């Protein structure tokens, strides 16, 4: 049995991972949260929920004593809080004798070009000085391109720049920039497997489902959905903070006020397109090599299952 503490365990990605761990019925999961609310997973057997104060390292270390693995799912919407809470969690984990630590990554390989991800780079530097850790990096979740259809219990869904539902897409230049797509189900499975992996965890914990260019993904969309209206934007305009397209996907998130939703969505899409062009979403296959028997769901298989036969 592995004792796992999940920091920020009420989020949608964390909940997908927790479900996969609990389904194995051989691990003990503790969800750590600052607010007196429960994770969607908290009704499951084998989970306990503890309210913590991330500013109090000594009490946090006491909670973590006896824990084998800490998985962190903090968001970076408040940069200073994310950095402070992450560092305190790392310090408390070391003090408590935690063996393995996974910081709040769960996405891109490079974070500096994505404002709400920048705290992750500071935490990587901090971890290099003081702890053994792995960075789980699945790239972008394939599931997003199935919007509005969901195949998971928890993952928050929004339309994206390649919009299969409305047969339209926005790309950078000719769309020859690569990104990695991995289903959230595959990522959650790999994390659960990693808990039981007896070898050394890699620092670079890439999880590679499908490596694909934006142009190839658009062609897949046209194969499944018919012709798409494709708009190309320039990297130069993106660098100047401009998205010169006739539309922009509107993202939904509990932290996005309705009155600012369009502005926030446009900003996120600009930074996402820039980061794709900079190679931020191409990840390694470290965990693929360590778990060679696991078969990942390809982007084509997943999206065919979602879209084939849809009007």
State where each predicted segment sits:
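Conserved Rossmann-fold cofactor-binding substructure of NAD(P)-dependent oxidoreductases
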Residues: 43, 48-69
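Terminal hydrophobic/aromatic helix or amphipathic segment near a protein terminus
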Residues: 205, 218-280
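Short, amphipathic alpha-helical "lid/cap" segments that border enzyme active or binding sites
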Residues: 61, 184-192, 296-304
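Oxidoreductase cofactor-interface core, primarily capturing Rossmann-like NAD(P)-dependent enzymes
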Residues: 2-28, 32-45, 55-58, 80, ...
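Amphipathic terminal alpha-helices
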Residues: 284-311
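NAD(P)-cofactor binding segment of oxidoreductase domains
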Residues: 65-101, 115-126
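Short beta-strands and strand-loop turn motifs
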Residues: 71-73, 102-108, 172
């Amino acid at each position: 049995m592995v004792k796992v503490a999940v920091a920020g365990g009420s989020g949608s990605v964390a909940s997908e991972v927790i479900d996969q761990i609990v389904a194995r019925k051989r691990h003990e999961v503790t969800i750590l949260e600052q607010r007196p609310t429960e994770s969607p997973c908290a009704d499951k057997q084998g989970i306990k929920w503890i309210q913590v104060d991330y500013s109090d390292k000594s009490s946090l270390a006491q909670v973590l004593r006896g824990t084998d693995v800490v998985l962190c799912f903090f968001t970076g919407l408040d940069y200073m809080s994310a950095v402070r809470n992450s560092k305190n969690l790392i310090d408390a984990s070391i003090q408590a004798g935690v063996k393995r630590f996974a910081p709040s990554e769960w996405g891109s390989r490079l974070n500096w070009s994505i404002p709400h991800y920048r705290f992750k780079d500071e935490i990587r530097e901090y971890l290099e000085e003081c702890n053994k850790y792995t960075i789980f990096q699945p790239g972008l979740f394939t599931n997003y391109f199935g919007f509005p259809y969901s195949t998971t219990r928890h993952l928050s869904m929004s339309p994206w720049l390649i919009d299969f539902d409305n047969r339209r897409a926005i790309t950078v230049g000719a769309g020859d920039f690569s990104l990695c797509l991995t289903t959230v189900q595959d990522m959650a499975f790999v994390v659960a497997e990693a808990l039981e992996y007896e070898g050394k965890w890699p620092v670079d914990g890439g999880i590679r489902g499908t490596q694909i260019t934006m142009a190839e993904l658009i062609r897949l969309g046209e194969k499944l959905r018919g012709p798409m209206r494709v708009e190309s934007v320039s990297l130069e305009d993106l660098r100047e903070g401009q998205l010169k397209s006739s539309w922009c996907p509107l993202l939904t998130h509990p932290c996005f006020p309705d009155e600012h939703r369009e502005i926030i969505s446009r900003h996120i899409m600009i930074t996402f397109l820039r980061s794709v062009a900079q190679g931020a979403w191409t990840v390694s296959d470290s965990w693929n090599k360590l778990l060679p028997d696991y078969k990942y769901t390809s982007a084509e298989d997943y999206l065919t299952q979602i879209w084939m036969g849809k009007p």
